[in-house]
Amino acid sequence: MNHMNKAFVSKVEKTLIPTCRIMGVNLAAINMPWLIKFTKKYIKELSGDYMCVSNVHTTVMSYEDASYCAVQNGGIMAIPDGGPLSSVGRKRGFSEMERTTGPDYLKEVLKISAEEGYRHYFYGSTEETLRKLQDTLTKDYPGVQVAGMYSPPFRPLSEEEDKAIIDMIKESKADFVWIGLGAPKQERWMAEHQGEIEGFMVGVGAAFDYLAGNIERAPMWMQKANLEWLYRLMQEPKRLFKRYFYTNTKFIWNAVIRGK
């Protein structure tokens, strides 16, 4: 269902965001403290807009698919979830650019949610994962307001179902709408619903699974050494080997060697 809202104009000036272009994707050359400060200042204006959480895989996909690249560049910003992206950015002179992951952003926002009064809607994943996620939120983030959760069917939605979801999220009065459909599906979904969903949409991929305890995150030393991809590869070798081998090679050739 392609109803991208061409008329949508961001209420926040994009020139406020330092940007490094890597393989055609405009990546925010930022870090977590900057992003949290930005979020707190502009959360009301960000309603209806979306943010991509970008890594090497999504950047290579964007390089090969102009329509997906337009989606990555069509939101308020694309943050550098992948360590290699921030490394390339720093080499290109963006000294403040640091790896800023989706799961970490979600956690940082949850930490300040009770005092800020933020309401959260979680869209994606399975009902079982959403139940576990709810347990984690209740236990680890007391006072956090969950406005709603919904696990959509895997098949394409009808116009009526889609409209019902838009209405359901609107009625929830959520400030944040966290999307856990995985790339590239979640980014395309956010772009199609830009200006239709009330709340700030953030595509956080596996963050629901991390918080629910389905997938363990890499130890901190591996995260800091940009080796989280290797840890994920050891967890799911069949699913991830081809993807990592192909995209990492393509990224190194284009972004690192050719300077794209």
Model-derived features: where do they sit?
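Conserved beta-alpha
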Residues: 86-168, 172
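Short Gly/Thr/Asp-enriched flexible loops that form oxyanion-binding sites at enzyme active sites
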Residues: 134, 187-196
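N-terminal nucleotide/polyanion-binding subdomain common to many enzyme families
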Residues: 2-104
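Short glycine-rich anion-binding loops that position phosphate/pyrophosphate groups of nucleotides
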Residues: 55-59, 181-186, 207
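Proline-aspartate-enriched helix->loop->beta-strand connector
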Residues: 169-178, 182-183
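A transmembrane-helix-recognition feature enriched in membrane-embedded lipid enzymes
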Residues: 84-89, 217-260
